[in-house]
A protein has these predicted regions:
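Active-site glycine-rich loop that binds ribose-phosphate moieties when present
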Residues: 157-171
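Flexible, glycine/charged-enriched surface loops at secondary-structure junctions
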Residues: 119-123, 223-235, 283-302, 358-373, ...
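C-terminal non-catalytic interaction/assembly regions of soluble proteins
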Residues: 2, 312-471
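N-terminal glycine-rich anion-binding loops that anchor highly charged ligand groups
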Residues: 41-59
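A conserved active-site cap/scaffold subdomain adjacent to cofactor or substrate pockets
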Residues: 207-314
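N-terminal amphipathic/basic leader segments beginning at the initiator methionine
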Residues: 2-34
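Gly-rich Lys/Arg/Thr-decorated short loops/hinges at beta-loop-alpha junctions or inter-strand turns
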Residues: 8-15, 53-68, 87, 131-154
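Catalytic or ion-translocation cores adjacent to nucleophile or general acid/base/metal-coordination motifs
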Residues: 115-131, 190-231
């Protein structure tokens, strides 16, 4: 069945629900959101935002180890509860859960649809964010030098932040599901709004308003009270049944934020303002691939229980450059932990750290934390811990870590921590160790014209592309 192009709507509301704010979010979140979208009726989109910078780095590592991996590992669990209902109700799904392998994610969704006995959905994959290949090598090297990166840096991968245009084009071409890799988080919302309302691509004010709606949605339950909660200071009811956010976007881009009825959490001026300012370095110039948003005259107004309206956002022309995240190998991270309890537990944990420093002295700096004494507020050199007198903590967990270019050298830490079982000091237990490759991240800017975003449809049989377009 060929894709059915969508017709832009100039009036009414577009409801966009968010069912994930990061990779590893709750997999039962989408159900109540889809229930609410179906009950409300009208055009609706379900987004999953699962791709932080570190998440993409981990996905790149996964694909290097296994060419079939590299997309969101929880993808089947996220979609299985709602895929059939979304397709039946005409709710489009848009997500960056493609990570380092969007085509692999599309094939995974087709496999899930077959498992559920569904007709093959029309899945579009957005590509163009990967700028690590030969075509971009010279431009990327120039951009890295301009950013002050180490001249010896060897990129493992490089991904540009794409905007909303290819998402909008895919939806207009009839996609039921749009799978992206690296796109700007708000663009997951801007794309559907751009396609639905038929805005011009230089309608900066409307694009800015939709961008801020997407910004409110992108972290999931941060805006419905999750990350906001601080008992006795900022109380939030029902954290165990936290509702995920829904934005009702009108034809001018203004939005009302809410959540499904009967779910936990809260949506009010406080939660919305906190998320509105999240990661916003300059409120007058929030840079995205789609627009530069200005919230200096924005108004946040409570219009009812768990309903907040955002207005007054303005926009300016989008930047001429796109941000690029470049990942490069930085060696191996080795970690080890062991617990000490009872009388003189802290003294024994400190002695264990001293033993490890002596045994691993030739490998470089060793970080040692005493969880329960000094860890989050400790420093890599251990000066803060050393400055504290040995106390009487009776429940202490020692954590040590080091980074080394050589895997075998880093692995020595894991063996030395395990050896503390019998080599002392007394009473150590609960050893846990880990060894994993580590990627560093450098950001730079590429001229927009050097990054070509496009989409193509991925048929269920894996045959040739059914349709293709460039943004």
């Amino acid at each position: 069945m060929p894709p059915t192009p969508a017709t832009p709507q100039r009036h009414g509301l577009l409801r966009v629900g968010c069912a994930a704010g990061f990779s590893g979010d709750r997999t039962d979140a989408a159900g109540p959101v889809v229930d609410a979208l179906i009950a409300a009726g009208g055009p609706a989109v379900l987004i999953f935002e699962t791709l932080a910078e570190r998440t993409l780095a981990l996905a790149q590592l996964a694909r290097h180890a296994d060419p079939d991996a590299g997309y969101e590992p929880l993808l089947p669990e996220l979609l299985r509860p709602v895929l059939a209902r979304c397709l039946a109700a005409g709710i489009r799904i848009v997500s960056n859960f493609g990570a380092a392998h969007p085509a692999g994610a599309a094939r995974c969704i087709h496999a899930l649809a077959r498992e559920l006995g569904l007709a093959p959905p029309r899945i579009a994959v957005v590509s163009g964010d990967d700028v690590s290949g030969p075509a971009h090598r010279a431009a990327l090297a120039t951009a890295l030098r301009a950013a002050g990166a180490d001249a010896d840096l060897q990129p493992v991968s490089a991904n540009a932040y794409l905007g909303a245009e290819a998402i909008a084009d895919a939806l207009r071409a009839g996609a039921e599901i749009v799978v992206c890799g690296r796109v700007a988080d708000p663009s997951l919302t801007v794309g559907p709004a751009l396609a639905h309302f038929g805005w011009a691509r230089d309608d900066w004010h409307r694009l800015a308003r939709a961008t801020m709606a997407g910004h409110l949605l992108e972290c999931g339950t941060q805006v419905t009270g999750g990350y906001y909660a601080d008992p006795g200071f900022k109380d939030v009811p029902g954290l165990a049944t936290l509702g995920y956010p829904i934005a009702e976007i009108d034809a001018d881009g203004h939005c009302t934020l809410t959540k499904p009825a009967g779910t936990g959490g809260r949506v009010d001026a406080h939660t919305v303002k906190e998320q509105l300012l999240y990661e916003l370095h300059d409120p007058a110039a929030y840079l995205t691939p789609d627009v530069v948003a200005d919230i200096t005259e924005a108004e946040v107004c409570e219009t009812g229980p768990d309903r907040v309206r955002l207005t007054g956002v303005r926009g300016q022309a989008r930047p001429d450059t796109l941000k690029v995240n470049v990942f490069h190998a930085t060696g191996w991270l080795a970690e080890g932990e062991i617990s000490y309890a009872g009388a003189r537990a802290e003294a024994r944990a400190r002695l264990a750290a001293d033993v490890l420093r002596e045994r691993l002295a030739g490998l470089g700096p060793l970080r040692a934390d005493l969880i329960g004494v000094a860890s989050l507020f400790n420093d890599d050199a251990g000066q803060r811990l050393a400055a504290l007198p040995t106390g009487e903590a009776r429940d202490v967990r020692l954590r040590v870590a080091l980074n080394h270019a050589d895997r075998a050298a880093a692995e020595r830490l894991t063996r030395e921590v395990t050896a503390l079982y019998c080599c002392g000091p007394a009473g150590g237990g609960g050893v846990r160790t880990a060894l994993r490759p580590r990627l560093g991240t450098v950001s730079c800017l590429l001229p927009r014209e050097q990054v070509q975003a496009r989409f193509h449809f991925v048929p269920a049989d894996g045959a040739a592309q059914a349709a293709e377009g460039a943004a």
